[in-house]
Amino acid sequence: MATTPYFPPLFAEDFGAFTPTVLSVATALAATAAVRDKAGGTALAERQLLRDSGLLTLAVPQAFGGQGAAWPLIFRMVRRLAQADSSLAHLFAFQQLQVASVLLFGSPAQQDRWLGATVGQNWFWGNAVNARDTRLQVTRTEGGWLLDGIKAFCSGAQDSDVLNVSVTTGPEPTDRLYLVLPTGRTGIQVNADWDNMGQRQTDSGTVEFRQVFAADHEVLGPPGAASSPRATLRNTIGQIILTEIYLGNAQGALIEAIDYTRTQAQPWVMAGVDRSVDDPLLQLRTGEMWATLRAAVALAEEANTAFQQAWEQGLDLNETQRGEVGMLVAAARTTAAKAALQITSQIFELMGARATTARYGFDRYWRNVRVHTLHDPLDYRSKEMGRWLFTAEPPNPYGYG
């Protein structure tokens, strides 16, 4: 009697009470991800799916009406959604990052106002924060500030309700203001000019500001962006998000490659087997990729746990502890990047030439990872780790620290 073989799940899919929602959203996103990757543009229907899912308020504390989910759980969700659709995972993750910005920089009254509205009005946040783009100028005026200029890499600005905006006020990395502005504010123009080879639907194009007024109460703080080691954890969240997007793409690529090899790949004539899955070289390569990815995931989980512990320390977090977390996160990111670049390329060695047909879109995993690994040079991450090991000097926590 024939039996159906049991294939164990390659990766854990436990998100506690949120498991049904996360898997439902991931399944829906995966169904059209390859087609939408080719189209680019703004994924309006999929953004609405995220709105309707209730997942946009995960990082909002329960005191403001949110779920108050722990960061390691949120990061695992980013990974799982990136497995299905890297662009929408990016938007989901950046939503949580903007919420964290309000928690880290905002006054109690600002937190109550903007996080309460995030829940009550189901806000989708965008950003115009890119620290390296200093073309956005700010001048003091009565009762606030005037913004003129442009910001690039403004992920999620399209179709957003509110923007987290940063402006440079001086030469030091700490000379920055963070502002919260409605996307529809007079003078703000969100441009549909994102057309990169990967992360095709993150809407990471430019936002222009023409004599945009920002009232004093719309500037986050006190405490502000440079008030304590805790405040610099925003940058750490950004680094972890990149790590999880790498890992999610690698997971998606490996799962698709295994499925394709089982069902469609033709064995190589010299392998001496009737099925590709019986080719010992393909078995070897697949086992190596799986082990590489599992090791990278384990390191990421360790870093995420350390981050949660740092987050919970609040203002008691000191510079040394912040540096240790930063180095662990850097180790996770560099390891995940190497693993993901390797896996998203090597899957074609399993599947063969037919798998390069454009309709499959298997190359999107590599393109997504390649774009995101260029966010800031990984060699400098490794250099910082080496310097820290030799001298105990922690990374600069500002900018990309």
Where on the chain are the PLM-derived regions?
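Generic structural signal for well-ordered, non-transmembrane alpha-helical segments
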Residues: 23, 248-251, 287, 291-294, ...
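C-terminal helix-coil-helix/basic helical segment that borders enzyme active sites and/or dimer interfaces
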Residues: 34-37, 295-334, 348-351
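Glycine-rich flavin
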Residues: 44-51, 57-159
